[in-house]
């Protein structure tokens, strides 16, 4: 009997100890919101928020926006910019030629002017100008590496229009570049009428007949922009049938202009640009 008890004690020594049942301990938690007074919860949150420090950070990059184009569509004299070069000014005279007479002039010019499509050169690449042109004047005229030969045989209608513009504006002109935009696909790209033969601050008188086209202008960027026109000032001028536009002052030095293609169908448009050409650029007023 004693031997059995001894063996039982030895076997029990090798047995794994009995795990005691874990007694769940209550977790330490904040008091239930149900036991808090109204508003106490928000005060606690407010206390935590007030402990946070607000740090203002300067924006890393300044956002630049291109200015909205200025639209000029009423009669008047407009100073569009002032720079060390001088004042850039445009004068708009809608209805300079009444509609009935303008209709007759458009028909005469489309039929009688010796229109020709010329080949231009830009960046050593030749291209067909997307419009027809003609030149009148005692002297040749060169632009975009195109030379217009002298043509002293003014059409009577053109001479009459030149005289009328001179009488009404006080300016005088000796030459005329004519442009025929046959449809919405014809255009003229960005440029300035700043050839040396025109002298300093040339005055350009532009008279339009036919379909209304938008005359766009953009200011030349300052040197620090490295030729980027993204943020420059812009002007849009709708040129209607019989409208006269005068560009004077520093407009050609400080601005570029163009007549862009249109998305919608357009009837023909004739544009007459009167100017003064000097025989020797060295003798031109600079």
Swiss-Prot record:
Residues the record lists as binding substrate: 115, 141-143, 194
Modified residues ((4R)-5-oxoleucine): 177
UniProt EC number: 1.14.11.33, 1.14.11.54
Expression tissues: Ubiquitous. Detected in heart, pancreas, skeletal muscle, thymus, testis, ovary, spleen, prostate, small intestine, peripheral blood leukocytes, urinary bladder and colon.
Enzyme class: oxidoreductase
Annotated region (Disordered), positions in chain: 21-45
Localization of this protein: Nucleus; Cytoplasm
Comp. bias regions, Polar residues: 22-31
Catalysis performed (reactions): an N(1)-methyladenosine in mRNA + 2-oxoglutarate + O2 = an adenosine in mRNA + formaldehyde + succinate + CO2; a methylated nucleobase within DNA + 2-oxoglutarate + O2 = a nucleobase within DNA + formaldehyde + succinate + CO2; an N(1)-methyl-2'-deoxyadenosine in single-stranded DNA + 2-oxoglutarate + O2 = a 2'-deoxyadenosine in single-stranded DNA + formaldehyde + succinate + CO2 + H(+); an N(3)-methyl-2'-deoxycytidine in single-stranded DNA + 2-oxoglutarate + O2 = a 2'-deoxycytidine in single-stranded DNA + formaldehyde + succinate + CO2 + H(+)
Post-translational modification note: Ubiquitinated; undergoes 'Lys-48'-linked polyubiquitination. OTUD4 promotes USP7 and USP9X-dependent deubiquitination of 'Lys-48'-polyubiquitinated ALKBH3 promoting the repair of alkylated DNA lesions.
Activity regulation information from UniProt: Activated by ascorbate.
Single Gene Ontology BP annotation: DNA repair
Gene Ontology cellular component annotations, sorted alphabetically: cytosol; mitochondrion; nucleoplasm
Chain residues that bind Fe cation: 191, 193, 257
Effect recorded for residue 257 to A: Decreases activity by about 65%
Pfam family, any one: 2OG-FeII_Oxy_2
Record-stated family: Belongs to the alkB family.
Oligomeric and partner information: Interacts with the ASCC complex composed of ASCC1, ASCC2 and ASCC3. Interacts directly with ASCC3, and is thereby recruited to the ASCC complex. Interacts with OTUD4; the interaction is direct. Interacts with USP7 and USP9X.
Function: Dioxygenase that mediates demethylation of DNA and RNA containing 1-methyladenosine (m1A). Repairs alkylated DNA containing 1-methyladenosine (m1A) and 3-methylcytosine (m3C) by oxidative demethylation. Has a strong preference for single-stranded DNA. Able to process alkylated m3C within double-stranded regions via its interaction with ASCC3, which promotes DNA unwinding to generate single-stranded substrate needed for ALKBH3. Can repair exocyclic 3,N4-ethenocytosine adducs in single-stranded DNA. Also acts on RNA.
Protein name as annotated: Alpha-ketoglutarate-dependent dioxygenase alkB homolog 3
Taxonomic placement: Eukaryota, Metazoa, Chordata, Craniata, Vertebrata
Gene: ALKBH3
């Amino acid at each position: 009997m004693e031997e059995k008890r001894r063996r039982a004690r030895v076997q029990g020594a090798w047995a794994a100890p009995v795990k005691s049942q874990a007694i769940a301990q209550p977790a330490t938690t904040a008091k239930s919101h149900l036991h808090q007074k109204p508003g106490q919860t928000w005060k606690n949150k407010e206390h935590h928020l007030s402990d946070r420090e607000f740090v203002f950070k300067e924006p890393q990059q300044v956002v630049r926006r291109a200015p909205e184009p200025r639209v000029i569509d009423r009669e008047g004299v407009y100073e569009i910019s002032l720079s060390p070069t001088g004042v850039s000014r445009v004068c708009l005279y809608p209805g300079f030629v009444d509609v009935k007479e303008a209709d007759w002039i458009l028909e005469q010019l489309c039929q009688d002017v010796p229109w020709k499509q010329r080949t231009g050169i830009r960046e050593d690449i030749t291209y067909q100008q997307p419009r027809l042109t003609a030149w009148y004047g005692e002297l040749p005229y060169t632009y975009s590496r195109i030379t217009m030969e002298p043509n002293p045989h003014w059409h009577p209608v053109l001479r009459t229009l030149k005289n009328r513009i001179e009488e009404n504006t006080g300016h005088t002109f000796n030459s005329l570049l004519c442009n025929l935009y046959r449809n919405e696909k014809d255009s003229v790209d960005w440029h300035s009428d700043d050839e040396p033969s025109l002298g300093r601050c040339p005055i350009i008188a532009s008279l339009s007949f036919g379909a209304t086209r938008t005359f766009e202008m953009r200011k030349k960027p300052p040197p620090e922009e490295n030729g980027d026109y993204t943020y420059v000032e812009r002007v849009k001028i709708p040129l209607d049938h019989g409208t006269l536009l005068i560009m004077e002052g520093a407009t050609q030095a400080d601005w570029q202009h163009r007549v862009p293609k249109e998305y919608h169908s357009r009837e023909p448009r004739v544009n007459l640009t009167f100017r003064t050409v000097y025989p020797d650029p060295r003798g031109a007023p600079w």
